[in-house]
Regions:
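Surface-exposed, low-hydrophobicity beta-strand/loop segments enriched in small/polar/acidic residues
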Residues: 1-125
Length: 125
């Protein structure tokens, strides 16, 4: 019997959000990145644009500000159509996308930063 493999969708990531899109912001992802739904992101202080979280950075991207709610290909230009899950939400731990090489402690720090914003990370089926 053939199997079907489907890409992740918002339902795999977002388990609860506040009514009237309160949990979501439309935001800008900085160029030179191709980010997937579920990517944990930080905000570069100088540009106010989103980038993948980088705990070793000192430009603001070391602090988690939310989780992407859609795929964003900003390889060539800044993309202003990113959906940021920024507050009052529950996301599935297994659907989060982390940069390679992050330690367990760095992930725990980022999860704590998300929790402080009201974005709870839970184990989910």
């Amino acid at each position: 019997m053939p199997t079907v493999s489907q890409p992740k969708n918002l339902g795999d990531l977002l388990k609860y959000e506040a009514p009237n899109l309160y949990s979501r912001d439309q935001d800008t992802v900085a160029a030179a990145q191709n980010l997937s739904l579920g990517t944990v992101v930080g905000r570069e202080t100088a540009t106010a644009k989103l980038k993948v979280i980088d705990p070793s950075a000192t430009d603001g991207t070391e602090i988690a500000v939310g989780v992407l709610g859609n795929d964003v290909d900003a390889t060539l230009i800044d993309r202003e159509d990113a959906i940021l899950i920024a507050r009052h939400a529950i996301v599935a731990r297994g659907a989060l996308v982390w940069p390679t090489g992050l330690t367990v402690a760095q992930k725990a720090t980022a999860v704590a930063q998300l929790t402080a914003l009201g974005v709870l990370v839970r184990d989910s089926a």
